[in-house]
Regions:
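Short beta-strand-plus-loop segments that form exposed binding edges in beta-rich domains
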Residues: 1-6
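Glycine-centered coil/turn sites that cap beta-strands in beta-rich domains
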Residues: 214-239
Length: 239
């Protein structure tokens, strides 16, 4: 869990003096992708506090990042709600941030929680938050640390794959851009060795999940003059 970050300049937009610049202080509209949105526990459901200030919105999307909380393990929905609320409280009142730093959090039962709206800039990779959607696994996955020896559950894995597949499809990102927190500046062990070693597998599984929606076999339609070839009623069979 790191600092909200330093000032970062990712791009400069220049407009002619007689041209009105586009409004960047609003959410980019998601596209209508083919991948269904997974079930996500809303902020209202886990009792989120309001952000302290207005959000800043992503001007584009080009990064995906996986974290671990390095604490706050949760094995069911009620534990997950409590831990997500604790993390928000720590980020807002311990770190002094605007809101919880992550966009999504996933517990060990596979429940997915909404953090900040994914259309707004988070606070999860200092110096690389713009365009970056961050997901945090509740728990601790770095074995050298005391009480930090967890491995990912099948339920968490499935939710991570489905969540990043939906995010990739909806916001036009390739699964190949998925990184662990440590891959940016090397100043942290996050997401822990037990998760970081899984990243190539995650990228492949997310790609396969997305591809499966574009390779579904076509539906064949057969017209059958049943029961009477001279009847106006037609029976259609779908294979």
């Amino acid at each position: 869990i790191i600092s909200e970050g330093n000032v970062e300049v990712n791009s400069v937009l220049i407009f002619p003096v007689d041209q009105e610049k586009p409004e960047l202080a609003r959410a980019l509209e998601p596209t209508l992708g083919d991948i269904p949105k997974p079930v996500i526990i809303s902020r209202e459901e886990w009792g989120a506090e309001e952000p302290k200030n207005s959000y800043s919105y992503h001007p584009y999307f080009d990064r995906l990042t996986l974290h671990h909380a390095a604490c706050c393990s949760a094995d069911d929905l009620e534990e997950g709600k409590a831990q997500v609320y604790w993390i928000q409280d720590f980020h807002q009142n311990g770190r002094g941030w605007n809101d919880i730093g992550y966009h999504f959090l996933v517990d060990r039962a596979g429940n997915i929680y909404q953090g900040r709206p994914e259309t707004v800039i988070g606070a999860h990779v200092g110096g690389a938050n713009t365009g970056n959607i961050g997901v945090c696994l509740l728990g601790c996955y770095h074995p050298p640390e005391v009480s930090c020896f967890q491995t990912i559950t099948p339920e968490s894995r499935q939710s991570i794959v489905e969540l990043f597949s939906w995010v990739s499809d909806t916001y036009g990102q390739s699964p190949t851009v998925l990184l662990g927190h440590r891959d940016y500046f090397g100043t942290t062990a996050c997401p822990g060795d037990n998760i970081w070693i899984e990243l190539p597998i995650f990228r492949a599984e997310i790609s396969d999940f997305i591809q499966s929606y574009f390779e579904m076999p076509p539906i064949s339609i057969f017209q059958s003059p049943y029961p009477n070839p001279f009847s106006s009623q037609i029976t259609l069979s779908f294979d």
